[in-house]
Curated annotation (Swiss-Prot):
It comes from Synechocystis sp. (strain ATCC 27184 / PCC 6803 / Kazusa). The gene is parC. PANTHER family: DNA GYRASE SUBUNIT A, CHLOROPLASTIC_MITOCHONDRIAL, DNA GYRASE/TOPOISOMERASE SUBUNIT A. It is found in: Cell membrane. Belongs to the type II topoisomerase GyrA/ParC subunit family. This is DNA topoisomerase 4 subunit A. The keyword Membrane applies.
């Protein structure tokens, strides 16, 4: 019922409950419509829309200089948003933060806060401007003809009720807000996936939910993380409400002590946290749990995060099990948390809870209506312009008559009337002719007018088709979406782990956790944080566990948990053992995969795989078995190696510390459950001493004896009889004595070395270095024979300070090898052109480089008579996480001099880093 109007100053008696009901309803609707909930069309709340439009009016486009945030906030307050300045600035800051918005709409200059919930600098210090996506996908072409405008709070200005968004920002950046009696919580999504979903609905409006959810598999948070359970996503997308469990990204590292005699330590390293988790508060939570005695096994806790990304190191005590600590962190801290989804937004100024499909359909309807208004407005403008051009061309064609009229006309009005009568033009055309500059009479200007007239006529015809034919309009919409995807889309940051349980099973007190526990493989791709105003590198905060009282003679060597206090102090970053890069050289050899850097942990039930199953190892050194061979169609990550089990029960694993261990095939999990770091399956002594796995494979049958060729990082080589590994026990066997920090880099099974003869020329050992040098020698001639496991081998090749080994193989003197550099240059080389050398030599330079930064990446034997067609293709992985394939026949014969041919097209700043297994 409308409220009665009363004279000003009159006191009206009113029941309290009626006034409270009316006032509260007005307040509730004001909060719902005008403050807390976003519009489904452009995904913006009023404050965000007003900030964008105010900056658009100020001309703060991406190609213009930054402007002080205080100026922007002042314009927003004075023109459109009569609220507190701090609330407007807080909204502006969140639009800049790349950890709050998946696709920030504003670019910032200065300190805009951090993931630790550090406050931003005051608005008088920070500067901002529109981001390219805001200008190119939100505000382009905004005008009263395209979208509706309304008066501001005092009707002195006009503001848009919605911006002509070309992308559904409601899904891209998400939104959260608490209104009166309702709330919204929408997670961010990947732009490329959302565009694919929109195009899928355009092509097939009755697209099934299953097909739609394949195109948009789940949220994509700006801070990364792992989504564990797809059931929560399915429920949220279908009903508009649901819980999505999100887990931080972690891996296990073996940290080498800074002192010589200090022991290696195991640490859990967190590189990504769930969305909206405060890192500093999370670290304090862990510290509190440790001090309260609720979380045992942690000896040190520090934050090593810097501008390159997040890194929180949790060092463990020597007897602690990493998987047990990790499970407790999931259960007791926000390292695993649920993101509550509520798809609530305004539709026609009314709050509506929608499914994912409804949100996409609402946006498509809005975008189609906006395009229609845009085309109609452009058509009207073009028709008016075409009319004027037609008049100008008529005047130029009748130039003599035009001059005569102008010469004898008494005034402009008379001239206009005579032009209309003699040339048959309209009033507007007459005005255009009279206002035409004299330069229009020239021939060149006349041609320009004619060309513009032709182009306008064609555009008008196109616009009439677009307005009259909905299918053509939808084609234009799809073209627009594809263009925006190409311009703004990026890789997914949040990995969705299918089949992972969302619930964390509580561990009983004093229960020994399973040694096989591990979390799924992790790819950390944290984006660099915004550089702060403060100069220099940021200090790292370390939470150190210290005794609150000095130790006494009777005290135990290790402090009790109850006696531990946490103190915050800056410390240098942990010194990590760097894995030496080395490419794969033959099918039976695995390069030095850095298991220490990525050693994730999950629970699985041991089971024996079928005899025909396959084993595969990824670039993180994680292994799993699968019933069928992986191909490019069913593998979603590059592999270091893949081979058939062939009924074997034991796998031989050799670490870079030179020790071999047997691994039961039954201890390896199936790929359907997870991958497990190969190093983690080994005994604790191997996990403590080794940082990488140098070799994994099966022993040959006794009737086909083979020797084991071992080459260290410092260039020492030795042969070991294969029979030494036949009786390998659980305690392992030391294969090579390593001194002075040397590590085992290559290990491969080879045919036993026999003296060469005319009938059997024998095999040569070929070693390649990163500087492009090759050393070839005959093992029999130089006296390379099988030695005992305790021998340290002989110095095969002298290496320079910045040089490392990149390839080792056994080949016949008449064979050819393929060489490839990090910059993508390759060639085929005849080994006969490399002179035979001896132990301790530098070798022969066989590769030239196009730049000083380039290095030889790998050396492989040319596949002459290869049994598998896959072996004729080589795959390489780059520092930009791109996969490049090279065919064997692309390597052309070259001599020792020359760069070779450019075989791989690389982006700027991209270079190849490793060879991976080729998947057919």
């Amino acid at each position: 019922m409308a409220r009665k109007s009363f004279p000003s100053g009159q006191i009206i008696p009113t029941d309290l409950h009626e006034e409270m009901e009316r006032s509260y309803l007005e307040y509730a609707m004001s909060v719902i419509v005008g403050r807390a909930l976003p519009d489904v069309r452009d995904g913006l709340k009023p404050v965000h829309r007003r900030i964008l439009y105010a900056m658009y009016e100020l001309g703060l486009t991406p190609d213009r200089p930054f402007r002080k945030c205080a100026r922007v906030v002042g314009d927003v307050l004075g023109k459109y948003h009569p609220h507190g300045d701090q609330s407007v600035y807080d909204a502006l800051v969140r639009m800049v933060q790349d950890f709050s918005s998946r696709y920030p709409l504003l670019a910032g200059h200065g300190n805009f806060g951090s993931v630790d919930n550090d406050p931003p600098a005051a608005m008088r210090y920070t500067e901002t401007r529109l981001a390219p996506i805001a200008m190119g996908a939100m505000l382009e072409g905004i005008s009263e003809a395209i979208v509706d405008f309304t008066g501001n709070f005092d009707n002195s200005q006009e503001e848009p009720t919605v911006v002509p968004a070309q992308l559904p920002l409601l899904l891209l950046n998400g939104c959260s807000g608490i209104a009166v009696g309702m709330a919204t919580s929408i997670p961010p999504h990947n732009l490329g996936e959302v565009v694919d979903g929109l195009i899928g609905l355009i092509n097939k409006p009755d697209l099934s939910d299953q097909e739609l959810f394949k195109l948009i598999p789940g949220p994509d948070f700006p801070t990364g993380g792992h989504i564990l359970d797809s059931e929560g996503i399915l429920q949220a997308y279908q009903t508009g409400r649901g819980l999505i469990p999100v887990r931080g990204v972690s891996h296990i590292e073996t940290i080498r002590g800074e002192k010589k005699r200090s022991h290696n330590r195991t640490a859990i390293v967190i590189t990504e946290l769930p969305f909206q988790v405060n890192k500093a508060a999370w670290i304090e939570k862990i510290a509190s749990l440790v001090n309260d005695g609720k979380l045992d096994g942690i000896s040190d806790l520090r934050d090593e995060s810097d501008r390159t990304g997040m890194r929180v190191v949790i060092e463990l005590k020597r007897d602690a099990e990493p998987n047990a600590i990790l499970q407790k962190l999931y259960r007791m801290t926000p390292l695993q948390s649920n993101f509550g989804v509520i798809f609530l937004a305004l539709v026609n100024n009314q709050p509506v809870q929608m499914s994912l499909r409804q949100i996409l359909q609402e946006f498509l309807q809005f975008r189609e209506d906006t395009l229609l208004r845009q085309y109609e407005n452009e058509l009207g403008e073009n028709r008016r312009r075409l009319e004027l051009l037609t008049g100008l061309l008529i005047g130029l064609e009748n130039l003599d008559a035009l001059i005569e009229i102008l010469r004898f006309a008494a005034d402009g009005t008379t001239a206009k009337i005579q032009l209309q009568e003699r040339l048959g033009i309209s009033l507007q055309q007459g005005d255009a002719i009279l206002g035409m500059p004299m330069r229009r009479i020239t021939g060149l200007e006349r041609e320009k007018l004619q060309q513009e007239h032709t182009d306008l006529a064609q555009r008008i015809e196109q616009l009439e088709t677009l307005i009259g034919d909905r299918q053509e309009r939808l084609k234009a919409l799809k073209k627009e979406l594809r263009g925006l995807k190409k311009k703004f889309a990026d890789e997914r940051r949040t990995k969705i782990l299918q089949g992972m349980p969302a619930k964390i099973e509580p561990l009983p007190v004093n229960q020994d956790p399973l040694p096989e526990a591990t979390i799924p493989p992790v790819e950390s791709q944290s984006a660099p944080e915004e550089e702060l105003d403060s100069p220099g590198e940021p200090e790292q905060e370390q939470l150190v566990l210290e005794n609150s009282s000095p130790p006494t003679a009777d005290s135990a060597p290790e402090a009790k948990q109850d006696d531990l206090n946490l103190a915050v102090k800056p410390t240098p970053k942990t010194v990590k053992q760097e894995a030496q890069p080395s490419p794969e050289v033959i099918a039976t050899h695995s390069k030095l995969v850095s298991v220490a850097e990525k050693n994730p942990l999950t629970l699985f039930t041991p089971q024996t795989p079928p005899a025909e199953a396959f084993l595969s190892i990824n670039l993180q050194g994680e292994i799993a078995w699968h019933p069928e061979e992986l191909t490019s169609a069913n593998s979603f990550e590059p592999l270091d190696q893949q081979f058939s089990i062939q009924g074997r029960e034991t796998l031989i694993v050799i670490g870079d510390h030179g020790k071999a261990f047997p691994v039961a095939i039954a201890d390896i999990p199936p790929l359907a459950v997870t991958r497990i770091p190969l190093l983690q399956i080994l005994p604790k002594s191997a996990q403590r001493d080794a940082t990488t796995v140098t070799f994994q494979g099966f022993l040959p049958p006794p009737e086909q004896p083979q020797d084991l060729l071992l080459v260290s990082q410092q260039g020492r080589v030795k042969l070991l009889a294969g029979q030494e590994l036949q009786e390998l026990g659980p305690r392992g066997l030391s294969l090579m004595k390593l001194k002075n920090g040397d590590l085992l880099q290559f290990a491969q099974l080879v045919t036993p070395v026999n003296p060469a003869s005319a009938q059997n020329p024998g095999k040569n050992l070929v070693i390649a270095t990163s500087n492009g040098r090759l050393l070839r020698f005959d093992p029999a001639q130089v006296g390379l024979t099988c030695s005992s496991p305790s021998a340290q081998g002989q110095e095969a090749m002298r290496l320079r300070a910045t040089e490392s080994l990149v390839g080792v193989l056994m080949a016949s003197p008449g064979d050819r090898v393929l060489l490839l550099t990090q910059a993508g240059y390759g060639k085929q080389l005849d080994l006969a052109s490399v002179r035979l050398g001896n132990f301790g030599e530098l070798g022969t330079t066989v590769m030239q480089f196009t730049s000083k930064a380039d290095r030889l990446l790998t050396m492989v034997a040319a596949n002459q008579g290869a049994q598998s067609p896959q072996s004729s293709t080589y795959d390489f992985y780059s520092n930009q996480q791109r996969l490049h394939s090279v065919q064997a026949d692309q390597f052309q014969p070259w001599g020792k001099d020359g760069f070779g041919d450019r075989l791989v097209d690389l982006n700027e700043g991209e270079h190849l880093i490793t060879q991976v297994a080729h998947l057919g």
